[in-house]
Amino acid sequence: MAVQAVHIQGDAFLVCVTHSLSTEREEVMGLCIGEVDTQKVVHIHSVIILRRSDKRKDRVEISPEQLSAATTEADRLAEITGRPMRVVGWYHSHPHITVWPSHVDVRTQAMYQMMDVGFVGLIFSCFIEDKNTKTGRILYTCFQSVQAQKSSEYERIEVPLHVVPHNTIRKVCLESAVELPRILCQEEQDAYRRIHSLGHLDSITKIHNGSGE
């Protein structure tokens, strides 16, 4: 099933942008909750901000446990709304680099589509400066992966993305936004524990690292 278009609610889009701007040095990632209609249009109603198990400037990884938790959250929203909600996509940021997906992004997207052919990927390119106006820009795109005709590799196909205006922030999106500071704090605590567990650190380094916990 080739997705024809993606419609994302304005408040869900706001959460994605806020999350993307939360860190300039590494990529961030989350999952999109919504439904797919009979016209093969994906409707994104909310997003889930995920805690990163590995923080890098050019990639991000999420634990299987969090993917399972996202499915549980989608089931909860389905009961509340009475609509067939499920995890319909993922999003991640590209700080200081192009909005176009890397070969790793394209392969990751292809892997997700093996589980759900209607799965989509969103990328938010942030901390980009317009050379003419010297103002910051945020670029975004939506894509899927397809098998290249003359290669075993995958290539991206762009999916039209439409932001549906919303006058207010719904409770489900507000809850996601409120979770962001807590998740960022947890990530820093996890990083501290990993460094603190290294046996070769000297006492001065341990005291310095511990002062910021």
Roles of regions detected by a PLM:
Residues 1-89, 93-213:
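MPN/JAMM (Mov34/JAB) isopeptidase/deubiquitinase module and associated MPN-bearing subunits/adaptors
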